Amino acid sequence: MKLNELRDNPGATKPRKRVGRGPGSGMGKTGGRGIKGQKSRSGVAIKGFEGGQMPLYQRLPKRGFNMRNRKKFAVVNLGLIQKFIEAGKLDAGQPITEDALLASGLIRRKLDGVRVLAKGEITTKIDLTVTGASKSAIDAVEKAGGSVAVTSAQAAA
């Protein structure tokens, strides 16, 4: 077999349809778009427009709201903290603060604080000082012999 003998399987590719190339092509003049109207013009149809029928996004009820002054936390899981300790990027002997997490590269920015969640396992005894932590994360750290100091009461829940 040579490179110039390579071919697609018969029927694997369809020939391109050249529309608007005269009546003999079967797709001449209007090119399969029908006559006049918004959809016959160039440009795409309006997104969400359903031909005058009440669109889906308007048929469904409005729900919820966005809190204007919502606090955003950098989320850290216990499994990742353990991984960074094993890799030597975090020192378990020192108290682990938000600044230590930032310096180690575990979080990119502090935002409104750091919140620790319990995904993964922690086996090393650590002393955490963070803005918030889930109850299960606090339990897991204390079970490993460590302690968690939560600096903000709102974020603890």
From Swiss-Prot:
GO CC entries: cytosolic large ribosomal subunit
Coiled-coil positions: none
Assembly and binders: Part of the 50S ribosomal subunit.
Q: Where is this region: Disordered?
A: 1-41
Species annotation: Dinoroseobacter shibae (strain DSM 16493 / NCIMB 14021 / DFL 12)
Q: Can you say what this protein is called?
A: Large ribosomal subunit protein uL15
Q: What is the lineage of its organism?
A: Bacteria, Pseudomonadati, Pseudomonadota, Alphaproteobacteria, Rhodobacterales
What is the similarity comment for this entry? Belongs to the universal ribosomal protein uL15 family.
The secretion signal range is none
Q: What is an annotated GO biological process for this record, any one? A: translation
Q: Which PROSITE patterns match?
A: RIBOSOMAL_L15 (PS00475)
Alphabetized UniProt keyword annotations: Ribonucleoprotein, Ribosomal protein, RNA-binding, rRNA-binding
The record's InterPro entries line, in alphabetical order, gives: Ribosomal_uL15, Ribosomal_uL15/eL18, Ribosomal_uL15/eL18_sf, Ribosomal_uL15_bac-type, Ribosomal_uL15_CS
As recorded in Swiss-Prot or TrEMBL, the protein's gene is named rplO
Residue ranges with Gly residues bias:
21-35
